[in-house]
Amino acid sequence: MLTMGTLTLVTSVSGSFAAGGTAAGAVGIGSALGAPLLGSLADRSGQRPILLLSAVLNTLAVLALVLTANATAAAGDFPLAVLAVAFAAGATSPQVGPLARVRWMSLTGNADGTAPPSDPARDLDTALSYESTADEVTFVLGPALVGILASLVAPWLPLALAAALTITLVPGFAVHPTHRAVPAARRSPGRKSRGAGGPAKLPWVVALPVFAMVCMGTFFGSTQAALSAFAAGLAGTEIAGLLYAVMGLSSAAAALSVAYWPRRAGLPLRWVLCAVLMAALAVLLLVPSSLPTMAAVLLLLGLPVGPVMVTVFAVGGRVAPAGRLGTVMTALASGIVAGTALGSSLGGQLAQLYGPGAAFLVPVGAAVTLALLGGGAAVVLRRKD
């Protein structure tokens, strides 16, 4: 909602797809850099204080973004101040989703990345499916809400609502009793066994799921930007959020179904197959010339998206070392946001220069790269086993 809200607001007040994409990219870059830092701090100091602090800082940053964007529009300029505030809004975004996954892994007995004798894999798969579905609701229905509020009321309202939700809901998650399931690393009983150096170092294999999430984010961001340009030629940029929500509906349903899929295939094969299907369906984005046709394509395209996210998060939890789940989960989330920034920027620039058709090539490339990374993950996990 923050990225799409920034894209919509800045595009609306500046009249430039490139400016909107750049501002949305600044949000993504800030989040990409800030999320792992917040995750590492949560690993070391506990989730509650970090979540409470980030909720306050993010609310202030988002409100400052609204004021700065509208002030620059009145002055007829687009200064670096807008990008700086957008960066701050992204960097302070509370990492609720990734830290919720850490809590689930702890509650299902998988906090150290290994499965105990009771084999909680199905419970964990169910939890991660639920979290990915919740992510889809926010990633996709959030932009839909942006489109509704921006078109019916004002372009600044979605960001104001985001600030209100952050300051009211994030503290509730921060103080929820489940935060005790993930003790701070500095107080963890297992710290001595790892030595005085603190939490374990991150292995290089963590880069595979992180880069995969960068591809996912690039897919999301470029699709959003391309849809904005596509909708502008038919009904106005505000309708792009509603189109994007169609993909989210099928993606959320498919993510929720992953817990019931056969487990024989394994995570790597599931990753590769879903990514290949994503790439094939993304090519269809080049075909539509009307809103109903585009909606139908997006409905199909969403089917492999949710399962890929569930699978990559599961792989990330599997390769994460003890005491670093918060860092790894936030790194995966930051990969999505960084990719969204990259995709928004690339998609916005291509849409501005060559039209939506060129911008739709970016999600195709992102899905192909995602499939290749899945092949690499298959090799690595086979050796790990």
Regions found by a protein language model. Name each.
Residues 269-312:
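C-terminal transmembrane helical hairpin of 12-TM major facilitator-type secondary transporters
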Residues 6, 94-112, 227, 307-320:
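Intracellular juxtamembrane helix-capping segments at the cytosolic ends
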Residues 56-76, 174, 277-289:
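C-terminal ends and interior cores of transmembrane alpha-helices
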Residues 323-356:
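A late C-terminal transmembrane helix in Major Facilitator Superfamily
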Residues 34-47, 150, 253-267, 351:
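Helix-to-loop junctions at the C-terminal end of transmembrane segments
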Residues 75-96, 214, 294-307:
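Hydrophobic core of transmembrane alpha-helices in multi-pass small-molecule transporters
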Residues 1-32, 196, 200-245:
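Helix-loop boundary and gating motifs at the non-cytosolic
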